[in-house]
Every structure is written in structure tokens, then in C-alpha cells.
Swiss-Prot record:
Example of a GO MF term: ribosome binding
Keywords in alphabetical order: Cytoplasm, Phosphoprotein, Repeat, TPR repeat
Organism phylogeny: Eukaryota, Metazoa, Ecdysozoa, Arthropoda, Hexapoda
Name of the protein described by the UniProt record: Protein clueless
Chain intervals for the UniProt region annotation (Disordered): 1-126, 266-287, 725-775, 959-1011, 1410-1450
Ranges of Basic and acidic residues composition bias in the record: 725-734, 743-765, 1417-1428
Length: 1450
């Protein structure tokens, strides 16, 4: 959900938010005033235009105030570009109507000016090739005064491109005017059009006064006003966040820091309470659950009313309608007084009705108020006081805490929530509409029309692209919310099927213009592919296809809006509806592709043209198949891909489940012979369905690997071509020699992977010079070869290219061509085989797909493990592990093979444990889904609690159906149980989720199957599932053996499983070791929530700015990188609004850059927002949230908030232990930070406990001679010396010295520092020993020995060490050093340019040899486009790790 709302729609942004954000930002800006210039943003977050078709489209985007500026590269933003003001950046001042004006500071000075050296675009980026019209983003502001009844005059700065509607929203959000909803804005007594831009209003000038005029209510306006009042009163209540309603979510940063960090004063070390909670100290076995949601008792605000609901006297009878009555309300105040309220066109008043008597006349004395808040304040003093308290508490919270998130975030644990009377909640629950759809022209939304219309918006200029992407994002967010609600209604039995007479599994549904289908093989459609198992995974693969075609974004090619929802064990696919598809049979609709898996095949010239364009990017090979009449039919996609021309004339494609080629490692095919290496590893594995496909990331990595080989081989042959008197024999030997060299090189690299990380990092520095020499030699050889080619050796050059193509397996003999035929191994499809050596050769196509699958196992999996050996950004839970696997193109079905490799490496123990936990959770999910389908709604909570007992406990698990449920009469309300008696046996033995019949269902026909499951039987099923699905032997038969053998924490398993399948448990401490009663009871299951999968729309221009900024950072140009990433954040705010995952990534990077540029206060302000955003959009216990907390603790310490820094680290450590346990490299980093700060506070014993644990982990994961270990020894020595234990300190510092000496040599600064530390410690130890000897011999000190000095460290030295631990090193460098660094950078770029020259030379020779370079260039361009398309969102979320690494090393 985007932040924009209709002027009358207040549920997306909490009332008062925008105004509060403005004031919050003002505080933050003042805190860093004088350091940098403040930048105003106009993200235009409240636009919601309605076009002629009734589709929601957004107004003009991204505007800034400042001087006009047109540049190819982005302008230099000022210091606070990250201020994503939700009130559109309005700078406000309040002017008393009686007093004079107070001049507001000029917040727009010098904004938008271009720096002389900054903002250059990276080569090849879109920023370089397009003139970005930043004029549209930097409009000069205009100041207007707003006069509201009963409020001070408000002065607001606006952009001339903003809409009048945004002033509307601003006033509804401000504290003084938030209780008004029904008003118009007038200038010179002329009412302004809500959708007019300010620049189009002729009378509007600088300093003009706009009047707020109260308007008469209509029924719609009255209902909106009542809903708005309810939202105001519930503003502080976390119930909606726990219930997963209205895109609300939790954040606990302010609870932990007890207010805004920016408002706090620096703390003295002696005034800090630094004692860690018991569950945070090292050695905790099972972390408690309650601290996950701190201070929940005080989370709810004061109660203003007992009841606010619509009256049972609604609707007004005819005579009262004629008197202007709109609706009736019923209120019970805190004084226990009961009132019936009438809403009329003039406002609200108390009438004389009672619960039994209808008397609509006004009460005596009558009091009419235009605002319901005013009326309630008049009749109830308690309401007035409570409402003021709510407003005050709301304004103390950070603005980001109240803004709606783009998508709903669900909590896996919830406290007991009080269920209150709420008429609006009741209305929403049983309404067939979705919230505010009735406020949109045309009533019910036409989702398909909206989704397609937004994609058709123009995209030539930056403002047009921003508008288009913003509209796509908004409509997509609304569609996901509607689809999720509809899917839950379908499973809960609240939607009538369009084919109610058929079996429950075969039923389909239409709700709110969305089509819903269940994940079952309804008509044996997938019989040959795996039945229900294939039908269950098909929607997920289809969603992948929709994602990549949307990313390619070919104009004229349309996909359906698609969302996949897992809920209560069922998989539901929600799709938008193609116009006209329900009016005719499918056979009549399809004009391209096949509806029967290749028996009949159709093609269409328009589809061929569109899909050929997309295929260039997706590496899909056009191919021909035979139809039923043995005629060749050309296709540019898989056979299953269907093309349908809708009644709207658009060309739709659907059923994209086979967009990418099959994975032959999981298909047993007679014609496929895998390599011996794969066979030895157990491949091929027969999967339970035949839809296994390779990932797009893998194909890109494979093509890139082959292209690098192609360049190298061509370069070697060109050198040979230029050598004089070269024999034919030498030429024939060159290729095998090269392959042997490459093989040796790969073996060497794999051997090096086992060496300590430090040696690897040292050796990484060395090859740079060798690579430079090699590149230079290649360039020289190619230059000579080119001169020969140009004169007489074109035939020989063509032969070189031909050999290189043959060596890498190119589809074409004389061109580098790698594309894939997705149908190459499909059963029942008859291919048209081409000539040998051409791209239409079926044999070549099959070999290529086999090679890609082999590349995954032989290269990508080892590369994945090697990358994580350095522990630079280690996965923390199953989700981050899965994301990392996917980024390497590795499917999760290879998890068993990954686990086998990890088990052989002790230094990857933590990753092995996380992978085993993820595999157990996924296997259990397969079993749970069938288990849930065989459970009646009456027994859901009992069945779920019984399942959790079987999974997590060893005590008694006898299922006890509660007496309440036992006495309920059985109901057949749920359609999925209508046919249980005759169809249950089939369903019980069926395999909807992909588990084998024997392993995932009891095979019983009774709907009480769930009562038969025991811990032993469940773990046996999990073992069978692990073996059959992942080919991995799970060596445990109970939770105890899993805990003892693999080190899994039960609380971590509970969390992972609840998140995976959508269970919400009660927030309390669970005793998993209980031997007397079950751990979980049915009252512990609070709710079940949907698990939603959908595509994430992109912000392309923001992505380009971001990646260019990353490139600048990696070059050490922090200031320029800061400016570019600030601009990226600005654009993200325009597309996504202020709350989004990618905005959080930008904020984290900007905070780190601010810190490096010396502005710790600015870093603190930005990082605080990053933490809140991560908690809101990712989750309070998400791995990203932990990372944000650790960053914030560093900046807090740098700003003097020592106690807060410790609290933040304690929170981060608790979350880490909850998710994955203490045995993790990141815990070592957190413990080192905690130890240092405790050391600074003089808590030496506590400090020693944490640093000892960090040392133990560092030795385990980095090796005993690693630099991390040396630093840990040094910290221990410092702490022990402060405790007076000089002997131990001396021993530890000796270890430090030994490691530094062996790693960096005796002359290195670190070694010399350690030697000096050793000298001082030795001196102090000798001194102490003399004193001790003197006391022992004489009973007292007799000699005049100097005192022992134990100097506590200064805060500055502690901060320096914290920086070092966290990878930040500030270095003072001389002019001589600058010159040296510059020469090194130039050398680096020279090497890069040499490589580029090699590539360019090869390409030119290829072109010369073929006399046609178009195809090759096109292939390479497509490869580049493919890289740009691949995972742009993932890059934006995770890509900053590389840049942060560069930041750290710089």
C-alpha cells in the first residue's frame, strides 16, 4: 500500500502523521544545522488521480524546490536529502492570529546547485545516456497561509506542481485540524479544485491566504468522518498490528531507547545502568520469548470511550431523511452515560432516542458540532482529557511508527488482546468490498484495467517514469491486499464458487473482480507432470514467469496480476481477469501456445514479435514444434505459455510456469547422460513433479562464465595466430593446454578456500599486479593480431572465433550465442530438428541445458560456500540463507547437497545448522499442509497445538478437544468439508503439497486424522520427506536428537515454522521440557495468517542512481556517493512512499557515509529511521533489523549515548540468539562491541565474559591465527590488565603479538603497538610481583616502589576500537600518501581498461570474421540488459553490502 490516500481516505496514514513528521524532521534538521545545508523534498505522496476509466493513477511525482538545473548526472543534494517527509516536505510556521509573524528559517537556500566535482554517472549507466530533466524535480516553492476555523493561521511552503488535495491531506493530518474531514479550500471566495495543480491557479501568489470552509455532510462524508474519529482514538492501540489489519506493524525502538535518541543528552559513564539482562549474557541455553515484545502492558493508550458504534436505529426512515438525517450513532462514555447521536448535513447532535424508543428530535439543550470530536468533548470530560493525552503521546512517537507499510507484516507471537466493540471493524469484516472501494467511481474496481492502464503510461522522461512506477506500485499494493483478503474469504467459506456443484477441490471463485483457484490438479491437467504435487508448485513457477516478463517490460505485452497465497494448508492463486475470457471457451480464446501440453499448438505473428523481444533479454531460444497436422509452428516461449487477445485488444500471456529451461538433475530421462561427477553425487534425483526449472540468476551466471572463457580462449588463439612459424600441432594442443590450466587454477582456488581467511585476503592483493601484466600482454598480442587480421588473416580470425565458440558450446558456429529452449525435454512435444552446428540443432540445445544444470552443481554451489567462508555477511536464518542461495541461482531443492558439503567444513558449522533447520522446517511444512486440509474448522486450534506438541516436545501429547468444542454441533459451513464423507479418503492419501502419500498423511479417511499423529510418527515422516525431497539423510528421530546432534534451538524452530506456515502463538514462556502436561494448548494458538507471495514493482531510475552511487563509494568518493544515494532515496520516496525495504537500504548506507564523513549526529538521525523502517517493513526480529540495531549502537556511542548504545546491542544480541543461537560469527561481533563498551564503563568482569565468548567464536570461525582473533586477545589483555590480572593479560597480549608478527610482519604498525603494550604489561607485572614479594617477606611494603597505574580507557580510544571492530578505519594521510593512493587507483583502472580493450578487440575481430557483428553485439547487449534486470530489488536491498565493504576497507 502506498502512502497516498484520497483526501477523504484516512486509513492509510494515521491522522496527524504528516504534521508530526514535519516537526520531527525540523528537530533533526536543527540538530545538524550549520554542518550541512537542509534539502526539501516534495515526494508528492498524497496524489490519487482518477482517470476516465475509474482507475487510480498517481499525479506528478518527485519535486524539489531550488534553482533550475539540467544535467546528465544528478545534482548535488544537500545534507539532509534523506528527509522523507510524509507531509511532502512542507516547511511550516504557525502565526498567531493576534500576534505578529515569526520569520521561518529559509530551508531552501542553495538547494539544487550542482557541485563541481560530484555526481558523475558510472559508465554505461542510464544516467550517462539520457538527459534526466531534473527541472521537473526542483520546482521553486511558494508560501501560502491557511486559515482554519478555531485554529492559528498556518504558513506552509508548497511546490507549484503539487495538488490542492495535498493541502487537504496535510490539514487532516495536523494535530490542530486532524478532527476535520469535510471541508473545502477557498481562495478569494472561489472553491479550489482538489485535483488542480497549484501552478494552474491564477490568483495564487506568494503569501496568499487559503480559507478552510466547512462543507455540508453527505452519507459518504459522514461515514468517512466516523471512521476517521475511530482511527484517531485507536492510534496508539497495537491490536491492528497483531491482527494484521490495515498495513499496521510493530516497532520497539522507542520503547528500548525510551524516546527519541536525538532528544537525549549525552550520558556520563558513571551514570549508566549497564547490567545486561540474564537472557543476554553468554551461555544462555534457550532464550525467553517475552522480551521479543517489550513493554506490551503499557503499549495501549488511554480509553476515551467505552463504545462508539452505529445505532440499531439506522437507516433513517423516510420522514427523517427529508429532515436531513444521514445516520445514527450510539455512544457510551467513560462516565457510563449513553447517548444516541444524529448525523445530519450540518454536523452531529445528541437526539432523544433510547435503546427502546426512537425519538430523533434534538436533546435539550441542543449542541450541534460540525466535528464529532468537538461534540464528544462537550458531553464527556473524560473523553476530552483522554483525547488530549492520546494526541500528546502520538506526537512523542517517531513519525515512521505510524505510517502504513506497503504490504502487511504479520507477527508470529501475540499477547492476549482485549476484544472491544468496534462497529467499523465489524462492517469491514463482513463487507464484500475492500475498505474504500465504494469511494471510487464505478464502485467495484476493475483490477485488470487498472493494472494494465498503469503499465501503458508514458515513460520517456524521468517525471513520466516516476509517475508510471508510482501508479504501478500503488495499484499493485492494493491488488495484493484485495487478493489476500479474498483468498482468506475463499478458504473460510465466505465466497460462493462459480461451479458450486463440483467437488471442493475443483471449485473456482470470483470475488471483487479477482479470479481464485486452488492448488489441486482438478482435471488431471498435471497428471503426467506429478498430479497435485505439480499443481501445487505451478502457481509459484507461474509467478516467477510473471516477475521476469514484468521486469523486461516489453511494450504491448501484458501479464495478469498474480498473487499466490498459502492459508490454512491450502494454496490459492489470485489473478486479475482478462476481459471477455469468461464469455467464451478456452479453446476459442487461445491464439498462441497450447492448452494440451503440445498436442495442438498455435502461433500468432504479433505474439512472436513481442515474445522475441522479451526472449532476447530472458535468453529464450525461438524454436519450432510440430502441431497435430505435422506442420512446423514457431514459438518464442514454452509450449505451455498461452497467448489470449482480450476484448480490450491487449495481448496477454499466461501460464508462464516453464519460462526457463528444465533442471535435468531432477528429471530421470533416458536420453540424458549426466557426467560421472554428477552421477557420483547421486544425480539424477527423481523429483515428485516434473516442473523443476533453472533460475534466471543461474542462467546469467552460466552465460557470463562461458563468455569469460570465450574471451580467454579467443585471446590465446589470437596470440598463437600472431606467433611466427607456428606448427599446426601447436595449434591443436593449445586448447587442451588452456583447459588444463583452467582446471588447475580452479583446483588451486578450491584448495585455497580451506586456508585461513586472512591468508586468502592477503593473497587477494597479490594477483592484481599479475592480472594487470596478463591483461597488458593480452592487449599487445591482440593489437598485433588485429593488424595481421586487417591485412591478410581474416580467414584465420574466423577460425579463431569458430574454435572459441566450439570450446564454450555456443549454439552458433561463428557467434557467441547462448539461449535456451524451455521445451527441449518436455514429453509429448515433437521438435523440428535443425542442421548440426546451427542454433536449431536439438542436440546442441539439450547439451546446453545439461551444461547449465551441471554448472550449478560443479561451480555455483562451491562458489556459494567459498563466498561465505569469509563470514562477511553471513545468513542468520532460513530466509536469508534462501535469498543467498537464490542470488547464486541455486534452487532450494539442492539444500540437501549444500548441507552435505557444509558438514565437511567445521568453519561453516553455523551455516550447516541454519541449513538443517531450514530443511526440517520445509519438510514439516509439507506434512502440515495435508494435515490441515484433513482438519475441520471446529478443531483447528486443537489440531495446530497438537501438531506443535508433536514437533517440539517430548511430554504427553494426547490431543484434548476442549469441552466447548466437544459440545458444539458439527457444522458444514465450510465448503471444503462438504464432500469429506465421500472424498476424504482420496484427499487424505493425496499429495497436494508435494509430500509422498505415505509420508505426509495418515491414509485414514476420518476428519480426526490429526489426533493420530505422535511425535515419533511425525519425525519419521520428516525423515522420509528429507530423504525423498532433498536426498538427505536426517539423522534424528525426535526433537531431542535434533537439538543434541545439530544444535537447533526449539524456540528458533518454533519461530521459523510459525513464519513459514502462518501460525500466531500466544506470547508467553513455553516449557518444552514439561513431562506432565502438553507444552501447547488450544488457547496458545491465537490466529492463523496468510503467507503471501507476489512480485515487487521496481524503481528503475532510483536503482540507476543507487548503483552509480555504489560505484563512487567503491572508488573512495564518499561525498559523491552520498549525493547519488540521496537522490536515489528521493526517487524511491516518490515511487514507494516513505516506507519501503529499499528506502531502508538507502538510509543505512547514507547513515554509514555520514559517519565516515565525520557527521555522527546526522548518522544517528538517519540510522534511527532505518531501524524503525526495518522493524516496520521487515519485522521486529528480521535479520536486517539486527544489522540496523548494531549500526545504530555504534552511532549512539559516537554521540555520547553510552547507555543507549548498550541497550541497542543487548536487543541485537537477544534477537540473534532467538533466531539462530549463540554459535554464530555475528554474535562474536556483537559480543566484542558489548565487551568494549562495558570495559569503557569499568564493568571489567562483565566485559571479560563477553570478550571470552567472542574470542571462542572467532577462533572457531576464522582460525586461531586470524586478525579477528588477535584483536579479541588484545581486548582480553586490556580488560585483564584493568582488573590487575597482569599475568593473564601478558599471556593474551603475547598471542596478539604472535598473530600480528606472523600475519603482517614485525615492522607493521599493529605489531609495534602490540610490542609496546607487551612492554608496559611486563613492566606492570614485574612491579606487581615485587610488591607481592615484599609483602610476603616482610608483611608490609618496605621498599619505595612506584604505584601501579591502571588507567581506564578514554571514550575516544574506545570509539576508535569500536570503529575497528565494525570495519571502519579513519586514517590521517599526508600529501605523499595521497599521491601514492592515486597512482594505485590509476593502476587499477588501467588494468580494468586493459580488460575492456581485450573485450573490445575480441568483439571487433568477431565482427570482422563474421562480416556481421550485429547478432553478437545484440547478444552481448542482451546479456547486459539481463544483468540490469536481474534482481534489481534484491540489489537495492542487499547490494549495499559490497559498498559497505569498500567503505570499511577505505
Amino acid at each position: 500500500m502506498a502512502l497516498e490516500t484520497d483526501a477523504k481516505n484516512s486509513n492509510a496514514v494515521a491522522p496527524g502523521d504528516a504534521a508530526t513528521v514535519a516537526t520531527t524532521k525540523a528537530k533533526e534538521n536543527n540538530s545538524s544545522a550549520g554542518k550541512k545545508q537542509q534539502q526539501q523534498q516534495q515526494p508528492n505522496q498524497n496524489q490519487n488521480l482518477v482517470n476516465g476509466n475509474g482507475n487510480a493513477a498517481d499525479g506528478p511525482a518527485a519535486k524539489k524546490k531550488g534553482k533550475k538545473n539540467r544535467n546528465k548526472s544528478p545534482p548535488e543534494p544537500a545534507a539532509e536529502p534523506v528527509e522523507a517527509s510524509l507531509s511532502n516536505g512542507h516547511a511550516e510556521k504557525t502565526t498567531s492570529e493576534e500576534g505578529g509573524d515569526t520569520a521561518a528559517p529559509d530551508t531552501n537556500a542553495n538547494v539544487g546547485e550542482k557541485s563541481e566535482d560530484g555526481g558523475g554517472a558510472a559508465p554505461g549507466s542510464e544516467l550517462e545516456t539520457e538527459d534526466i530533466d531534473l527541472d521537473a524535480l526542483h520546482e521553486v516553492g511558494i508560501t501560502v497561509n491557511i486559515s482554519s476555523p478555531g485554529a492559528d493561521i498556518l504558513s506552509v511552503q508548497l511546490s507549484s506542481m503539487e495538488l490542492v488535495q495535498e493541502i487537504h491531506q496535510l490539514l487532516m493530518d495536523r494535530e490542530e485540524t486532524c478532527h476535520r474531514t469535510c471541508f473545502s479550500l477557498q481562495l478569494d471566495n472561489v472553491t479550489l479544485d482538489n485535483f488542480a495543480e497549484l501552478k494552474t491557479i491564477e490568483q495564487l501568489e506568494q503569501g496568499s491566504t487559503i480559507r478552510v470552509v466547512e462543507e455540508p455532510y453527505t452519507m459518504r462524508e459522514a461515514r468517512i468522518h466516523v471512521r476517521h474519529v475511530r482511527d484517531l482514538l485507536k492510534n496508539l492501540d497495537p491490536a491492528d498490528a497483531y491482527n494484521g489489519i490495515d498495513c499496521t506493524s510493530l516497532t520497539y525502538l522507542n520503547t528500548i531507547t525510551q524516546g527519541d535518541l536525538l532528544d537525549k543528552k549525552k550520558t556520563r559513564p558513571d551514570s549508566v545502568d549497564c547490567t545486561p539482562p540474564e537472557y543476554v549474557t553468554p551461555g544462555v541455553s534457550e532464550p525467553p520469548l517475552l522480551p521479543l515484545h517489550p513493554n506490551i502492558k503499557n503499549a495501549k493508550g488511554p480509553q476515551a470511550l467505552k463504545v462508539l458504534t452505529t445505532s440499531a436505529w439506522n437507516p433513517p426512515p423516510g420522514p427523517r431523511k427529508l429532515h436531513g438525517d444521514l445516520m445514527y450513532l450510539y455512544v457510551v462514555t467513560m462516565e457510563d452515560k449513553r447517548f444516541h447521536i444524529s448525523a445530519c448535513s450540518k454536523g452531529f447532535y445528541i437526539n432523544q432516542s433510547t435503546d427502546d424508543t426512537f425519538n430523533p428530535k434534538p436533546d435539550n439543550p441542543s449542541h450541534l458540532s460540525h466535528s464529532l470530536i468537538d461534540l464528544l468533548s462537550h458531553i464527556s470530560p473524560s473523553f476530552r482529557r483522554a483525547f488530549q493525552t492520546i494526541q500528546k503521546r502520538r506526537t512523542t512517537r517517531h513519525a515512521f511508527e505510524r505510517v502504513a507499510t506497503p504490504y502487511q507484516v504479520y507477527q508470529w507471537a501475540s499477547p492476549v488482546l482485549e476484544h472491544t466493540v468496534d462497529a467499523i471493524r465489524a462492517e469491514d469484516a463482513f463487507s464484500s468490498k475492500l475498505g474504500y472501494e465504494e469511494h471510487i467511481p464505478g464502485q467495484t474496481r476493475d483490477w485488470n484495467e487498472e493494472l494494465q492502464t498503469t503499465r501503458e503510461l508514458p515513460r520517456k522522461t524521468l517525471p513520466e517514469r516516476l509517475l508510471r512506477e508510482r501508479a504501478i506500485f500503488k495499484v499493485h499494493g492494493d491488488f495484493v491486499t484485495a487478493a489476500t483478503r479474498g483468498a482468506m474469504a475463499v478458504i473460510d467459506g465466505n465466497v460462493l464458487a462459480i461451479n458450486p456443484g463440483e467437488d471442493a477441490k475443483m471449485q473456482m471463485f470470483i470475488w471483487n473482480n479477482i479470479f481464485f483457484s486452488l492448488g489441486f490438479d482438478v482435471r488431471d491437467h498435471y497428471k503426467e507432470l506429478g498430479g497435485d504435487a505439480a499443481a501445487f508448485v505451478a502457481p509459484r513457477y507461474d509467478l516467477h514467469g510473471v516477475r521476469v516478463y514484468n521486469a523486461v517490460d516489453v511494450e504491448g505485452l501484458y501479464t495478469l496480476g498474480t498473487v499466490v497465497i498459502d492459508y490454512r494448508g491450502y494454496r490459492v492463486t489470485a489473478q486479475s481477469i482478462i476481459p471477455g475470457i469468461l464469455e467464451r471457451e478456452q479453446e476459442q480464446s487461445v491464439v498462441y501456445g497450447s492448452i494440451d501440453f503440445g498436442k495442438t499448438v498455435l502461433s500468432h505473428p504479433k505474439y512472436l514479435d513481442l515474445l522475441r523481444q522479451a526472449g532476447k533479454h530472458l535468453k529464450i531460444l525461438p524454436h519450432a514444434v510440430l502441431n497435430e497436422r505435422d506442420e512446423p509452428v514457431e514459438l518464442c516461449s514454452s509450449v505451455e505459455c498461452k497467448g489470449i487477445i482480450g476484448n480490450d485488444g491487449r495481448h496477454y500471456i499466461l501460464d508462464l510456469l516453464r519460462t526457463f529451461p528444465p533442471d535435468v538433475n531432477f528429471l530421470k530421462l533416458p536420453e540424458v547422460q549426466l557426467s560421472k561427477e554428477l552421477v557420483d553425487m547421486g544425480f539424477p534425483i527423481e523429483h515428485r513433479h516434473k516442473l523443476c526449472c533453472l533460475r534466471q540468476e543461474l542462467l546469467e551466471a552460466f552465460i557470463e562464465d562461458r563468455y569469460v572463457s570465450f574471451i580467454r580462449i579467443a585471446a590465446v588463439h589470437l596470440q598463437q595466430l600472431n606467433a611466427k612459424k607456428q606448427s599446426e600441432k601447436t595449434e591443436e594442443k593449445a586448447l587442451p593446454a588452456l583447459e588444463e590450466a583452467e582446471k588447475e587454477s580452479s583446483e588451486t582456488k578450491e584448495a585455497e578456500a580451506e586456508k585461513p581467511v586472512e591468508k586468502k585476503e592477503e593473497e587477494k592483493q597479490q594477483p592484481s599486479s599479475n592480472e594487470t601484466k596478463t591483461a597488458e600482454a593480452m592487449v599487445n598480442a591482440i593489437r598485433e593480431a588485429q593488424s595481421n587480421v586487417a591485412t591478410s588473416n581474416e580467414v584465420q580470425a574466423a577460425e579463431v572465433v569458430k574454435r572459441a565458440c566450439a570450446a564454450v558450446g555456443s549454439l552458433k558456429e561463428k557467434e557467441f550465442d547462448f539461449r535456451f529452449n524451455p521445451d527441449v525435454f518436455s514429453n509429448g512435444i515433437r521438435h523440428v530438428d535443425g542442421e548440426e552446428g546451427t542454433c536449431s540443432s536439438l542436440a546442441k540445445q539439450k547439451v546446453l541445458v545439461q551444461d547449465a544444470a551441471e554448472f550449478l552443481v560443479v561451480k555455483q554451489i562451491p562458489a556459494f560456500i567459498k563466498e561465505h567462508l569469509a563470514h562477511s555477511s553471513p545468513p542468520i536464518d532460513g530466509q536469508s540463507l534462501t535469498e543467498s542461495l537464490h542470488s547464486h541461482g541455486i534452487n532450494v531443492r539442492y539444500l540437501g547437497k549444500v548441507i552435505k558439503l557444509l558438514a565437511q567444513m567445521p568453519r561453516m558449522d553455523y551455516l550447516h545448522r541454519i541449513a538443517v533447520l531450514e530443511l526440517i522446517v520445509r519438510a514439516t511444512k509439507h506434512i502440515y499442509y495435508t494435515y490441515m486440509q484433513n482438519t475441520e474448522p471446529l478443531h483447528l486450534s486443537a489440531a495446530i497445538s497438537h501438531f506443535l506438541n508433536c514437533l517440539l516436545t517430548t511430554g504427553p501429547v494426547n490431543p484434548a478437544v476442549s469441552s466447548e468444542e466437544a459440545h458444539k454441533k458439527r457444522s458444514n459451513g465450510n465448503k471444503h468439508n462438504k464432500h469429506k464423507s465421500k472424498g476424504n479418503k482420496q484427499q487424505a492419501s493425496g499429495n497436494q503439497n508435494g509430500s509422498s502419500a505415505g509420508s505426509s498423511s495418515g491414509g485414514s479417511s476420518s476428519s480426526s486424522d490429526w489426533t493420530l499423529v505422535t511425535p515419533r510418527s511425525l519425525w519419521q515422516q520428516i525423515r522420509r520427506e528429507a530423504k525423498s525431497y532433498w536426498d538427505w539423510e536426517l539423522d534424528c528421530d525426535s526433537i531431542e536428537t535434533a537439538v543434541s546432534k545439530y544444535g537447533i534451538l526449539r524456540i528458533s524452530l518454533l519461530r521459523a515454522f510459525c513464519l513459514k506456515v502462518g501460525i500466531q502463538v500466544l506470547l508467553r514462556e513455553y516449557n518444552f521440557e514439561s513431562k506432565h502436561k502438553p507444552t501447547f494448548g488450544d488457547e496458545d494458538i491465537v490466529n492463523v495468517f496468510p503467507v503471501v507471495k507476489h512480485i515487487s514493482p521496481r524503481a528503475t531510475d532510483a536503482y540507476n542512481f543507487y548503483t552509480t552511487g555504489q560505484a563512487k563509494i567503491q572508488q573512495g568518493m564518499f561525498k559523491e556517493g552520498y549525493e547519488l544515494i540521496s537522490e536515489a532515496l528521493n526517487l524511491l520516496n516518490n515511487v514507494f512512499g516513505a516506507m519501503h525495504q529499499e528506502n531502508g537500504s538507502c538510509l543505512r548506507m547514507l547513515a554509514r557515509l555520514s559517519y565516515l564523513l565525520g557527521d555522527a549526529q546526522d548518522a544517528l538521525a538517519i540510522q534511527q529511521r532505518a531501524v524503525i523502517m526495518s522493524e516496520r517493513v521487515n519485522g521486529i526480529d528480521h535479520p536486517s533489523t539486527i544489522l540496523e540495531y548494531t549500526h545504530l549502537s555504534l552511532y549512539s556511542f559516537a554521540n555520547g549515548h553510552v547507555g543507549m548504545s548498550l541497550k541497542l546491542l543487548y536487543r541485537a544480541r537477544y534477537l540473534m540468539v532467538l533466531i539462530c543461537g549463540e554459535d554464530h560469527p555475528e554474535v562474536a561481533l556483537i559480543d566484542s562491541n558489548i565487551s568494549l563498551i562495558l570495559h569503557a564503563l569499568g564493568e571489567y568482569e562483565l566485559s571479560l565474559r563477553f570478550i571470552e565468548h567472542a574470542l571462542k567464536l572467532n577462533i572457531k570461525y576464522f582460525g586461531s591465527k586470524a586478525m579477528h582473533v588477535a584483536f579479541s586477545y588484545h581486548l582480553m589483555a586490556r580488560t585483564q590488565s584493568c582488573m590487575g590480572d597482569f599475568r593473564s593479560a601478558l599471556n593474551n597480549e603475547k598471542e596478539t603479538y604472535s598473530i600480528y608478527k606472523s600475519q603482517v610482519g614485525e615492522k607493521h604498525e599493529k605489531t609495534r603497538d602490540s610490542a609496546e603494550c607487551l612492554r608496559l604489561l611486563t613492566q606492570q607485572a614485574v612491579l606487581l610481583q615485587r610488591k607481592m614479594n615484599d609483602i610476603y617477606s616482610n608483611g608490609k611494603l618496605t621498599s619505595d616502589l612506584p604505584p601501579i597505574h591502571i588507567t581506564p580507557p578514554s571514550m575516544g580510544s574506545v570509539l576508535d576500537m569500536l570503529n575497528t571492530i565494525n570495519g571502519i578505519l579513519f586514517v590521517q594521510i599526508s600529501q605523499k600518501d595521497i599521491v601514492k593512493v592515486r597512482s594505485e587507483i590509476e593502476k587499477h583502472f588501467k588494468a580494468n581498461s586493459a580488460e575492456n580493450e581485450v573485450n573490445d578487440a575480441i568483439k571487433s575481430i568477431v565482427a570482422a570474421a563474421n562480416n556481421n557483428g550485429d547478432t553478437e553485439a545484440e547478444t552481448k547487449d542482451a546479456t547486459k540488459d539481463n544483468k540490469d534486470l536481474a534482481g534489481a530489488s534484491t540489489q537495492l536491498t542487499n547490494g549495499d553490502k559490497d559498498a559497505e565493504t569498500a567503505v570499511a576497507s577505505s
